[in-house]
From Swiss-Prot:
<dbReference type="InterPro" id="IPR001383">
    <property type="entry name" value="Ribosomal_bL28_bact-type"/>
</dbReference>
<keyword id="KW-0687">Ribonucleoprotein</keyword>
<dbReference type="InterPro" id="IPR034704">
    <property type="entry name" value="Ribosomal_bL28/bL31-like_sf"/>
</dbReference>
<dbReference type="GO" id="GO:1990904">
    <property type="term" value="C:ribonucleoprotein complex"/>
</dbReference>
<dbReference type="GO" id="GO:0003735">
    <property type="term" value="F:structural constituent of ribosome"/>
</dbReference>
<dbReference type="GO" id="GO:0005840">
    <property type="term" value="C:ribosome"/>
</dbReference>
<dbReference type="InterPro" id="IPR037147">
    <property type="entry name" value="Ribosomal_bL28_sf"/>
</dbReference>
<protein>
    <recommendedName>
        <fullName>Large ribosomal subunit protein bL28</fullName>
    </recommendedName>
</protein>
<dbReference type="InterPro" id="IPR026569">
    <property type="entry name" value="Ribosomal_bL28"/>
</dbReference>
<comment type="similarity">
    <text>Belongs to the bacterial ribosomal protein bL28 family.</text>
</comment>
<dbReference type="GO" id="GO:0006412">
    <property type="term" value="P:translation"/>
</dbReference>
<dbReference type="Pfam" id="PF00830">
    <property type="entry name" value="Ribosomal_L28"/>
</dbReference>
<keyword id="KW-0689">Ribosomal protein</keyword>
């Protein structure tokens, strides 16, 4: 499983540990990923996604999972999240007809 947020696309960064004597050794900065179950109000379904901790508060701030994923750019979403977004859009248009 990749160390990447499925909603924001945040992944592993690389940098240096710097000691007191200024020696530099390579290291990885990994995102704080959590496996979270989001509930969609439109489709009435539950979806488990691997997201970073900052994204969880962003989803709440946007007004819920449906509002966040509908305004999210398709380029940063994972293939699983894009499929969920497509399902939400289809259900929303079917309910509005």
């Amino acid at each position: 499983m990749s160390r990447k947020c499925e909603l924001t696309g945040v992944g592993v960064l690389y940098g240096n540990n710097v000691s007191h004597s200024q020696r530099k050794t390579r290291r990885r900065f990994e995102p704080n990923l959590r496996s979270v179950k989001f509930t969609s109000d439109i489709t009435a379904g539950k979806y488990r996604l691997s997201v970073n901790a900052r994204c969880i508060s962003s989803v709440e701030k946007a007004g819920g999972f449906d509002a966040y994923i509908l305004q999210a750019d398709d380029n940063v979403l994972s293939s699983n999240a894009r499929a969920i977004k497509k399902k939400i859009i289809q259900t929303k248009t079917a309910k509005s007809l």
